[in-house]
Amino acid sequence: MLTGERIKITGQINKVGEVVFVSKYIVVVRINGINETFTLADFAAQDRYKFYIFRNKEYKIIPKVNVGNLNLV
């Protein structure tokens, strides 16, 4: 995921925005001119949020991180 890419967030919310900032723990997305921050917990809550970015097609972003005993792949 790179800054400037379009991202679609579905689940409890259904929005499309532009990725503004990406770090190991957060993603900031500009949606309708407002920056919204999503955390690692948001990515982990697969029942709440699913993240897609737009390139040639939509695909799900599953961050690969290790936090203590938590291993998300």
Predicted regions and their residues:
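Conserved beta-strand residues within beta-sheet cores
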Residues: 4-6, 16, 58
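Basic/aromatic-rich interaction segments and small domains that mediate binding to polyanionic partners
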Residues: 12-47
